[in-house]
């Protein structure tokens, strides 16, 4: 499902622990790290997609997390030209994302990245809240900055 402007609707997931750290996941067979994210299917709400992607990518269920906040609007990034599939119709030039800030309320041993036949990640770790800004691929950096900045006050006020 791609919107008329060429952006694919997507959810981004910032999962925090009680220490305020965030889950940082390594793409399978790559030295590339990112937050879990994934597309919103037709007839799915962003929250529905959040829970589906959370389960597919990190093995967590609805009862394992608490939603602390969600970005107010869509945050967009364009794909680098080398990643645009120019022969696909409709043409997808990037992603538009709703970002969710979650708190893990279950034990971290519940995090599993091998529950699907095609896992997206092969490792993870807890990192400081702002660490991802210096590590994520360049074309996603501004969206990460905007999401982290908008959601940070909710992390600090959660107690």
UniProtKB/Swiss-Prot annotation:
Xref: InterPro entries: Nudix_hydrolase (IPR020476), NUDIX_hydrolase-like_dom_sf (IPR015797), NUDIX_hydrolase_CS (IPR020084), NUDIX_hydrolase_dom (IPR000086), RppH (IPR022927)
GO process annotations (BP): mRNA catabolic process
UniProt keywords, alphabetically: Hydrolase
Domain Nudix hydrolase: 6-149
UniProt keyword annotation of Chaperone present: no
UniProt motif (Nudix box) ranges: 38-59
EC main group: hydrolase
SUPFAM superfamilies: Nudix
A GO term for molecular function: mRNA 5'-diphosphatase activity
Matching PROSITE patterns: NUDIX, NUDIX_BOX
One CC-aspect GO term: cytoplasm
EC number: 3.6.1.-
Cofactor(s) the record lists: a divalent metal cation
Domain of life: Bacteria
Function: Accelerates the degradation of transcripts by removing pyrophosphate from the 5'-end of triphosphorylated RNA, leading to a more labile monophosphorylated state that can stimulate subsequent ribonuclease cleavage.
PANTHER family: M7GPPPN-MRNA HYDROLASE
Family affiliation: Belongs to the Nudix hydrolase family. RppH subfamily.
The protein's name in its UniProt record: RNA pyrophosphohydrolase
């Amino acid at each position: 499902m791609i919107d008329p402007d060429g952006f694919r609707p997507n959810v981004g997931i910032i999962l925090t622990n009680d220490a305020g750290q965030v889950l940082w996941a390594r793409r399978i067979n790559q030295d590339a790290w990112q937050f879990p994210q994934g597309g919103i299917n037709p007839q799915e709400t962003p929250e529905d997609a959040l829970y589906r992607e959370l389960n597919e990518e990190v093995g967590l269920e609805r009862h394992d997390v608490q939603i602390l906040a969600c970005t107010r609007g869509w945050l967009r990034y364009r794909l680098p030209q080398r990643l645009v599939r120019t022969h696909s119709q409709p043409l997808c030039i990037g992603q538009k994302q709703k970002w969710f800030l979650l708190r893990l309320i279950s034990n971290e041993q519940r995090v599993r990245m091998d529950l699907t036949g095609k896992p997206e990640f092969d490792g993870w770790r807890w990192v400081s809240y702002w660490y991802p800004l210096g590590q994520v691929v360049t074309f996603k950096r501004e969206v990460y900055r905007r999401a982290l900045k908008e959601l940070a006050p909710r992390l600090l006020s959660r107690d």
